[in-house]
Design a protein with these regions (language model features):
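Detector for methionine-enriched segments
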Residues: 1, 14, 35-38
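N-terminal secretory-pathway/extracellular module detecting exported/lumenal segments
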Residues: 23-171
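Bacterial N-terminal signal peptides
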Residues: 9-17
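Bacterial N-terminal signal peptides that target proteins for export
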Residues: 1-8
Length: 171
């Protein structure tokens, strides 16, 4: 009889211990569904990864600059398993100096790109975003396979990529 009570008690303890984890999993799933429901209608998904590091990268609200037809402003949709970040960024689509300008709390980053040229894994997102903003019909395509298209559009594919970091003043 004591063993039955012990097993029953152990079952109660286990269910009480698992309940927060189950609630957390449900809350996480609800959060993910809410984020998906909030996605803008003009969102174009550029990249996704599943699993523990679930991530969705998208672009929306792309607009040209009336003063400079080579500039585009847009919002990124960076959806993580437990967070949503929506920064506003810009790109320059010129054939001579294509670039992406992004920022965080510490700095502004000016990244000179080489559309259609060789690229590193660390610049893949830059190229995905640049192609989507400058040539929306190619949004979401793997930038590594766009060399012929880049040359067709007048890009040299032989530019030197670099990054300039402009530190922001400390608060």
């Amino acid at each position: 009889m004591q063993s039955i009570r012990w097993i029953f008690g152990l079952g109660l303890v286990m269910s009480a211990a698992c309940q927060p984890a189950l609630a957390e999993a449900l809350n996480r799933e609800q959060l993910l569904e809410q984020m998906k429901a909030m996605r803008p209608v003009d969102l174009v998904v550029l990249d996704q990864s599943d699993g523990a590091d679930e991530y969705t990268l998208g672009i929306f609200a792309v607009s040209g600059d009336p003063a400079d037809p080579e500039l585009r402003r847009f919002k990124l949709w960076q959806e993580y398993a437990d967070n949503l970040v929506i920064p506003t960024e810009s790109v320059n689509c010129s054939r001579e100096e294509p670039l992406r300008v992004t920022r965080d709390t510490e700095a502004i980053y000016v990244r000179k790109l080489n559309p259609g040229g060789s690229q590193r894994a660390s610049t893949r997102e830059d190229h995905l975003v640049w192609w989507a903003a400058c040539h929306p019909e190619l949004a979401g395509q793997d930038p590594a396979g766009l060399a012929d298209k880049a040359r067709e559009l007048g890009y040299s594919t032989e530019l030197i990529e670099s990054q300039e970091v402009l530190r922001l003043p400390a608060p």
